[in-house]
Amino acid sequence: MQSTLSQSPGSRFSQYMALTKPRVTQLAVFCAVIGMFLATPGMVPWHVLIGGTVGIWLLAGAAFAINCLVEQKIDAMMRRTAWRPSARGEITTPQILIFSAVLGSVGAWTLYTFTNPLTMWLTIATFVGYAVIYTLLLKPMTPQNIVIGGASGAMPPALGWAAVTGAVPGDAWILVLIIFVWTPPHFWVLALYRRKDYENAGLPMLPVTHGEKFTRLHILLYTVILFAVTLMPFISGMSGAVYLTSAVLLGAVFLAYAWKIHRDYSDELARKAFRYSIVYLSLLFAALLVDHYARPLLGV
């Protein structure tokens, strides 16, 4: 193990950045930013856009750092996560706690200063939901950890909407519901091809507790529900034909993956489905944004 003194500043920075799970944070912040733009017919005020993005990013990073701290022993037993600096003992517990506290404090101040108190408190509640309720309580105790804990991970669009309007109306909750229903099939395909990792770590993920066949069926069922839920922005009048077409096409591909996994499973297929699920959510929310600004131009 390298000592702190022997590490370059760049290496140290990379280690701290790894604690924030940058790729996961990017997707969460992206969905929050989409929520900001959908909340207004025009341009999001710059101070809200920048302040909201930075504040949500910092608090999300703080939550992920706590997750890495709590799960460092578990991460060390799993091939997918053994590389993390927390799992390798390259960053100490006090250092992670201080890092998370700084990120969280600066993030909360940024949201309070540049957006509004509601956004700050909702983001703090999301932090608690992920770092405490999901990480400490749900994940090690129940195979429904992803289903219940998915509520905190689904909040970014509502946070973005609140940052602009100071409220969270029904349309924002539709976006939250989409991510909430997307979360189980997204994580269960990962848990399928990483089942041995979770089994060795003693985590009660669905494939470990209920078996592969049961999990494959539930991936299909949740993907069908997701397909239906993604039609709600069009049904409610929030979005138009551009979004509807995108949602149907993207959802059809996701359904095809879920059906193949249910009928003829392979680890390689599950890997492809997992990667696609990330692309799916990104493109779905991008379609919401394009539709939002295209509708006035198209007169629909």
Curated annotation (Swiss-Prot):
Gene Ontology molecular function terms on file: protoheme IX farnesyltransferase activity
Listed InterPro entries: Protohaem_IX_farnesylTrfase, UbiA_prenyltransferase, UbiA_prenylTrfase_CS, UbiA_sf
One cellular component (GO) term of this entry: plasma membrane
Subcellular location: Cell inner membrane
This protein's UniProt keywords: Cell inner membrane, Cell membrane, Heme biosynthesis, Membrane, Transferase, Transmembrane, Transmembrane helix
Segments passing through the bilayer: 24-44, 46-66, 94-114, 118-138, 146-166, 172-192, 217-237, 239-259, 278-298
GO terms under biological process: heme O biosynthetic process
Enzyme Commission number: 2.5.1.141
PANTHER family according to UniProt: 4-HYDROXYBENZOATE SOLANESYLTRANSFERASE (PTHR43448:SF7), PROTOHEME IX FARNESYLTRANSFERASE, MITOCHONDRIAL (PTHR43448)
Other facts noted in the record for this chain: Carbon 2 of the heme B porphyrin ring is defined according to the Fischer nomenclature.
Job description of the protein: Converts heme B (protoheme IX) to heme O by substitution of the vinyl group on carbon 2 of heme B porphyrin ring with a hydroxyethyl farnesyl side group.
UniProt name for this protein: Protoheme IX farnesyltransferase
